[in-house]
């Protein structure tokens, strides 16, 4: 079991590392490539677009051909793309590399969740996903620090050399440590069961909506945080970085506490708590009259996401013993596209940063509480495949 956890954690961590590692070098990258920082800032969106593209096919391929080949392919693609970024001589080539890098990270991300679905029951999976969420929260804090230390001695290309090393490590884990977890029953004889695992069943759709709205909340918070903290509250860059590090610390603390809470409380209780914290955050931010109250509202967002997201993801994957890859892909695509759609729509409507955040907090909490109260899992809604194949 340990091998699956190590490999899954490594596969997932390529995704945030690919986002956060290079940010500290952005000014120097822009100068060397004769591009503006504004032009290169779309590298974030390009990376997510690459991930979404990979998710369109990675899940289905993983269900048909196995988790291990897709994990290896994703790591190799990530390595090649990182090398392309390090050799880029203009902005267009750099953005192309970032898109391909997103494809590699997307393949690995989908496979990681499929592996956890294959090897863990619902309660253990919820605990592991909560821990994984906490570890993921560490990356946005540590990756820029590591990037800064690297750039004290080396050029910006070394940031992508570091990503190449990470990709090689994941590839080696996938080749030599990871064992195939795709259910051995995935064959023509299992076609009726595969067809029965419909992506249109109401329980899956409810958890799809909950996870998508929750990701929309946290990404809206991240997207609006510079405006909220630096423009509206007057923080300088140092104070902004410190505040974001503290919120990440809260996320980590809650994520690491959630597995213990699952031993005491029902998953539904934690998900309702999550949405209650979102609702409270929306109310606090809408009524806030001081910086301290606003900061308290922001901490509620981080705590709410951390206590409920892993549990909701676990339940979403629960009904799929033979189509875990496809289900993981659908969840990933919905979360990336749904959150991007909300941020774009709110900007088009003309919401300011604070109202954009308050709107998604209150809307998310009300919809999700309704879904949690009305749609619950069946008594025996999942089948676990403990065996693995070399």
UniProtKB/Swiss-Prot annotation:
- Which Gene3D superfamilies does this chain map to? Multidrug resistance protein D
Which compartment or compartments is the protein found in?
Cell inner membrane
Which GO molecular function terms does the record list? transmembrane transporter activity
What InterPro entries does the record point to?
MFS (IPR011701), MFS_dom (IPR020846), MFS_trans_sf (IPR036259), Multidrug-R_MdtL (IPR023697)
Q: Which UniProt keywords apply?
A: Cell inner membrane, Cell membrane, Membrane, Transmembrane, Transmembrane helix, Transport
Membrane-topology annotation of the record: Multi-pass membrane protein
Per the record, its GO cellular-component terms are: plasma membrane
- Tell me the HAMAP family matching this sequence: MFS_MdtL
Supply the name of the protein.
Multidrug resistance protein MdtL
